[in-house]
Amino acid sequence: MAIAKKIFLLVSVCILASVASAQNLTILHLNDTHSHIDPERGGLYPGRGGVIEQAAYIDSVRVADGKENVMLVHAGDFGQGTSYFTEMNGDIEIDILNAMEYDVVCLGNHEFDNGIDELARRLANLNLPVVCANYNFAGTTLEGLIKPYVILEKAGKKVGVIGLLTDVSSVVDRNIADLLKYNNPAEVADKYAYMLKVEQGCDLVVCLTHLGYEGESYTDVELAAATRNVDVIVGGHSHTDLNKVDKVYNLDGEPVGIVSNWKWGLTVGNLKVNFKQNLLYGKYLDLLPEKVFSLDGSWFPYPAYEDREGWNKVLGKSAVHLINNGVKYLDYKWQIVPATSYLEYERTGERKIMENPQSANRVALNTLMLAELAEGKGRFIDQLVDGLWHLSNSPTWVLSAHLPRQKTGRSLPDPREQLIDLGSGALGAQVAVAWHFFNKTFDKIDPVISYVIQEAVKKQILDPYLNTDEYRPNWWLGFELKPGQVVNNWNPWCNADVILCFLLMEKNQERLDQALRQSARSVDKFIEYIKTDGACEEGPAYWGHAAGKLYDYLQIMNDASNGRFTFFDVKQIKDMGEYISRSYVKDGWVVNFADASAKLSFTPSVIYNYGKAVGSEEMMEFALYNLADSKKNNFKEPRPLIWNDAYRALESLRYIREMDSKVDALNERISSGESYDSVLNSLRTSVPSHVWYPETEFCYMRNNDGWFMAAKGGHNNESHNHNDIGTFTLYVDGIPMFVDAGVGTYTKHTFSKDRYTIWSMRSDWHNLPVINGIYQHDGAAYHSADVEVSFKKSASRMTLDISGAYDEESDCKSWVRDYHLDGKVLTITDTYSLKARGAADVENFLVQGSVYLPGDVTPEGYPVKKGETVVINQGVRMMIKYPVMLIPSIETKELSDPRLTNVWGDSLRRISYTSSENAPLSGRYVFKITEF
C-alpha cells in the first residue's frame, strides 16, 4: 500500500500544477502490465518499467498537455504475472489504477485467473469504469460492474470508448467459460460505434481491446477492417511492440489507427488524436439561438424581378446576350420522358435516352429565366409557365441511373417513394429560383401555378430531405453508408441545391432549422473525407462538382446568414480551391487520376468567385487565364453562364464587371507591345513548382525544363476509384507522354460489381507493374505504404511501397517504386522482394504517341537498340532505357467511346516489359526516361 500512496501523492502534486491546453486529445495507454509493479530487476530489460516511472511520465504529459486533454487507458491484463498478484490477490493493482487516475480500463483474459467472484470483489473497489461489450455478464457477480461502453469528456469533446475481449473459452477455467458467451467483436463494435457516433454525437470512438494485434483468433486488424465509425483501436493481449500507429482502412475507406504497447509497462504509449472538425455543424449550433436564417427569401443577393434598375446594374452589356439566347427558346417544345426511356437503363444500361431530354428542358428553363430577368417585359413568362407546369407534374426529377435505389430496385419512377439525386436536386434548385423571382407574376395569371410549383418542390425535395427513413437511399448525406461507400461530390452538390430550395421556399421555421442542421452535419462529412490537404481525389474534372459545389453551399449559407455563417478563412477551404489551379498542366491538360478526363475546359466565373471568397490571387488569375484566346492572341470578355445550373448562372454575374475590367487591362498590356505569351504566363507565376498532398498522397513535380510529373499513392477505394496505386503521368511542354486513359461514357456497369472488368479501371492499363502475374485489387485494404517525398532545387523524388495494393497471391513482400525527376530525366526504379515466384513481372506504360522498339527505325532514321524504346508524340521524342533482361512489346487499344476519343483520338498504346518466369525473388527494374 505504501507504493500506492506514494504514487497518489505524486499524482496529486502534478495535477495541481497542470494548466489548460488548447490542443487535441492525447491518449496514454498501457496493456499487459501483468502485475509488474517494480522496474525489471534482470533479464533483457533491467531497470526498465515500474509504476513510479510510469506515474512520473504520465504526470509530465498531463502537465504539458493539460489533464483535461489527456485520456489514460489500460487495455487489459493488469493483473497476474508476479508475486505481487499471488501474495496480495490483485488488490495492489486496483489501488494503482485508482491512484494513477486511469480514465477507463478493459478486461483481459488473466483478470479471470482467480475466478469471477474474486474478480468482482476487486472491481468493486475500482473507482473508474471497466468496459467489455462482447460478453454478457448478466446473472454473474460481475453484473453491474462492467459496462459495454463509456462516454468521456476530454479535450472539450465527447469520446466514446467500447471494450472488447478475446475469446477466453480456451484460456480460462472451464467453469468460467461456461458462464460467459463470447460475441463477435466486429458485430458488437459496429453496433455500439454507430450508436455512439450517430445517435450520441461522439466526436471520437475508441475501441479499447484485449484481442491482440496479430497471431490471435480475432485481431485488431480484422476488427478495423470489418467495422464503421471506429476511429482508434487501443489494443493489448499479443504483447506486440507496435512502435508506430498502424493504419487500416475500414468498410467506408476511412483510416483507423491501431496502437498497442508491448508488455509489462516497459513503456507508456502516447497517441495524439486530431478530432474530426464538425466545422459547419458547430458553427450552426452557435448561431441557432440568434435565428440568423430567415424564411422570406429576402437574403437572396439579386434584385427582385420587378427591380429593373437593379437588373440593369447587375447585367450591363450582358443583358443583350441573355435576351438573344432566350429568343431561341420562345418556340421550344418541352420534352417528355416516356416510361420506356427510364426502363432502358435496366434493359441495356443506356442512360442518355432519359437524361438528354431532361437536360434539354433544364437548359431551356435557365435560358428563358435569365432572358426574362434581363428584359423584364413578360415576353418569356408564358413559356416559363409551360415549362414549370410540365416539370412540376413529372413523376420524378431523379435520373434513371439512380432510381434503382428505390425499394423496388427498378429504374421506373415509383410515386410512392421520392429520392434526391444530382438531377432532382439541381432541377429543384432551378424551379425554386424561378418561383422566387416570378411567383408574384404567376399569381397574377393564376395562383394555382405557384401552388403547383411549391407542392412539386415539397414532394420532390423538401419532404424527402427531412425524412430520416430515407438516409440510406439518400446515401450522399453520409449518415448511413453501405460498406465500401465513400462521401464524394454528390454530398456538397446535392446539399447546395437542396438548401437553396429550403432557403427560398420553406415557410416553416422548425422545418428550415431541421434542414439547416442536417445539411451542416452532412457537409461536415464531406469536409472530413476530403482531408485537410485539400486535394480532390476524384480529379480536376470533378472539382467543379466537389470543391466547387462546396463553395456554392458555403456561399449560399454565407449570404443567407448575412455573413455570419462563413468559412472562407479556413485554410482547408482555400487549399481545396487552389487544387484546381495546381492540377493544371498546360493547354487544357490536367492531372487526371481516377475517372477524371485528362483534358478540360473550365468555368472561369466559378474559379474566380471561389478565389475572391478565399483571398486567392492564384485562383483569380487562373480564372482569367482560362479566358485566353490563343487564336486571336488576346483575352475574351467574360460571359454569363447559360447552362442548366440556375444558381451558377446567377453567380456568374456576381463579379462579371470586375473580371471584365481585368480582362481589359490584360488586353491593354498586349496592345501596348507586351507579348501575348508573356501576359499569359504572368498569370501562372504564383503556382508552386512542387505540390505534395500528404493525406491524399498526390505529388506534383514541375520544373523549368517544361516537365510536369504527377504520381499518387492512397488506397483503392477512393471516390471514382481506379486500381492505380503508384501510377504516374508525365507531360513535356504540355504534351502528354505517359498518360492515364480516364474513363469512358458512364453505363450501368461503371458503378456496379463489374466496374473492375472495365479495362481503364484496371492497374494493368495504368503505368504500373503486374507483380508475379497479379494485378492490383480494389478495396480500401489495398493501399500504399511508407510514402516519402523530397523537393530540392535540382531534383525531386517520390518513393512508396505499392505491394499492399496487390493480393496476397502475388507473394510480394515489398515493391518500392521510386520516382526521381532531375531536369530532363525521369528515373523510375522498382525494387522488389517476393516470397515465391509463380509468374513473370510485367512493367506497363501507357502512351498516346507512336512507339518504336528495338529493331525499329524512327522517322528521323534512328535505329532503336536493345534496351531502348522511343516514344514520339506531337513532336516530342522520348527515350526509355530499360533493363535488357526484360522483353518489350506493344498492345494498341482501339478507342470508340466519344468520352475517350475526344481526348486521345482513336487509340492508345501500352508498352509492356516482361521478365522471365524464373526471374529472381528480389531485384530491381530501372527505367530511365529522357528527351531524345
What spans do the regions from the language model cover?
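Acidic, metal/ion-coordinating pockets
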Residues: 23-275, 279-282
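Active-site lining segments of carbohydrate-active enzymes
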Residues: 410-539, 552, 654
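Solvent-exposed loop and edge beta-strand segments that line ligand/cofactor-binding
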Residues: 299, 349-361, 408-424, 470-492, ...
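Long, well-ordered core segments of solenoidal/helical folds
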Residues: 326-337, 384-402, 449-477, 514-534, ...
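Bacterial Sec-dependent N-terminal signal peptides
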Residues: 1-24, 276
